Amino acid sequence: MQLSILIGTNRPSLLACSRIAQACSWAGPNVEVIVRDNSGDARKRALLSQFQRDNCKIIIAEPCDALTNASEILKLAKGDFVFLLADDDFGFDHAVASLPGMIEQIGSDQSVAGITGLYAVEFANRSAVVEYKNIDSDNVELRVAGFLSYGGPNVMIYAPVRRELFQRVFSFTNTLPFLCSFHDQIICLLYLLNGRFARLNRLLYLYDMGPWEIDETAQKRDLEFYKAAGFDPAINKLHWLLCAFEGAALVRNIDIFPVIPLTSRQKIADLWFSSMFLRFKGHSRYTFDSPFTGEAEKLCAKLQAATGQLSFHDILSEISEFVALLSKTRAQAYFDFWDAILSKRKPIRQDVASPKLMAAGGA
């Protein structure tokens, strides 16, 4: 089997059902489609059962969180590549039909981590066609720079990726002390560190911005992740700092990607940190009337004024001290995990919170 198309679905809407029906039509000798519904909606379940066919598996699951749904569906995939789809987005028929042939051509080339193409993005009043520059390059520094040069929603998270790589990165991210909405950015970073993305000259995926288009509603979605992890809304102020720190720390210190020279690792880490730190400085983040707003603003001002003067350990200490104001247990878990990463020790996750959501894009 060359390609596994995976849909974990919770929405009971007709739109979601129509997207799933379309995906089921792609099933064939080289493409398996696996749908796992955890909505608990009886009418939807009855409809989905009619979509089952050869190489198309419909799984009716009990209501559960999105992370569990994704974990369970991934266990069933047999394709060399996996293509993860959201049930409210849209894949293009001709692109999907082209994927098995492309996988046949590139499958033995271990320098290829995944497949990219053109992406359609729907806004409230306009549409756009976008692509990522240079992520098909053999040069890892150019790949990461190309990813960072794109300023729109992270549609690369919906790209066909080698199943082995997908599972490896998924397993690692599930060891993180908390899952936040920016972790889709870091997942893509880890993909790019592992290899290039072969380019398909077709529209591959349509992403509807929906609530992510308006800054305040987008940040409310971010806040859902933080609340699920047990955080006060004030942590939202540090959103892009956390992304900057975690991504750069991983580039410098972990070994779940091929051998990359230390000089290149340092360049990529610096590039990642500086790019995300610019977002931290330039993107106004809400605290939603948190009683810790003052402390969050003081820390942001301190860190923004200390550019280039703090080590990773210094930044970790500052973050952990702030998180301790919100929860000492969570602060200790965060510090212990990232201190292990920085010290090149194997981190041990402490289950202080059960993540209920999985990152799915965002601006």
What do these predicted regions represent?
Residues L165, V169, P177-N201:
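A short, conserved alpha-helix in the catalytic core of glycosyltransferases
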Residues V82:
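Short aromatic/hydrophobic "clamp" motif used to bind/position activated sugar donors
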Residues A61-A77:
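Glycine-rich, basic loop-to-helix element that forms the pyrophosphate-binding segment
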Residues V96-V130:
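Conserved donor NDP-sugar-binding/catalytic core segment of glycosyltransferases
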Residues R11-S25:
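Short, well-formed alpha-helical segments that are part of the catalytic scaffolds
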Residues A120-S127, N194, L200-D232:
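Active-site donor/metal-binding and catalytic loop motifs
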Residues Y132-G151:
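Short, flexible, basic/aromatic active-site loop/helix in glycosyltransferases
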Residues A21-I60:
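Acidic donor-binding segment of Leloir-type glycosyltransferases
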